[in-house]
Amino acid sequence: MKMKKLMMVTLVSSTLALSGCGAMSTAIKKRNLEVKTQMSQTYWHDPVSERTVWLQVKNTSDKDMSDLQSLIAKDIQAKGYTVVTSPDKAYYWIQANVLKADKMDLRESQGWLNRGYEGALSGAALGAGITAYNSNSAGATLGVGLAAGLVGMAADAMVEDINYTMITDVQISERTKATVTTDNVAALRQGTSGAKIQTSTETGNQHKYQTRVVSNANKVNLKFEEAKPVLEEQLAKSIANIL
């Protein structure tokens, strides 16, 4: 009986320690804010003496990004360009739209989130195993085993790896001396089973390029209020560095 109790105490103690390992590891590794920005496509342009830019920033996400245009304009000006209010007077057009700025789970692709949850789940499972082994005190042992699992779950709940992602589509238009012909094709839905193909052709004096900028902010227990300024800063630098 004493040996069984000793083994039970040892197992429960080990469970309590292991259940908090995932949370402790997360807290240590993710204690500092990490920000990464990537662009889906590279935009190349020939060097020219013209250094005027017309900037248009839209936001179709559900987050407030009212300061974003001024931040981007400031970084563009820091590179020696003049931001103008009239598109007709600009050599470059930069148009950006924030599609989404929200919490996104990137840990599944990295295989990191699943390891974090194993601590709590193993505690609950081990509690059931102890109950089966110690049949003489099943009720008491079940309570201890469940408590071990709940401690692990509580620790994991208090320490959460949070990642916020901002997705922005960018279109760059560059004036050219050549005549540019653009063919537009659009498929318009007609009800649930049909579609209408709409085509048009236009001529102009601009080459247009499109890319997507994805910015991530990652930290333990991160709040959007903390992530927002660094996400905006990274996006502004990325767009300005196109020029």
UniProtKB/Swiss-Prot annotation:
PROSITE patterns per UniProt: PROKAR_LIPOPROTEIN
Protein biosynthesis among keywords: no
Keyword terms, alphabetized: Cell outer membrane, Conjugation, Lipoprotein, Membrane, Palmitate, Plasmid, Signal
One GO CC annotation: cell outer membrane
Classification via InterPro entries: TraT_complement-R
The keyword Membrane belongs to this UniProt entry's keyword annotation: yes
Xref: Pfam families: TraT (PF05818)
Leader sequence residues: 1-20
Protein's cellular compartments: Cell outer membrane
Membrane topology: Lipid-anchor
Lipid-substituted positions (N-palmitoyl cysteine): C21
Disulfide bonds: none
Residues carrying lipid (S-diacylglycerol cysteine): C21
Homology family: Belongs to the TraT lipoprotein family.
Function: Responsible for preventing unproductive conjugation between bacteria carrying like plasmids.
Name the UniProt record assigns to this protein: TraT complement resistance protein
Lineage of producing organism: Bacteria, Pseudomonadati, Pseudomonadota, Gammaproteobacteria, Enterobacterales
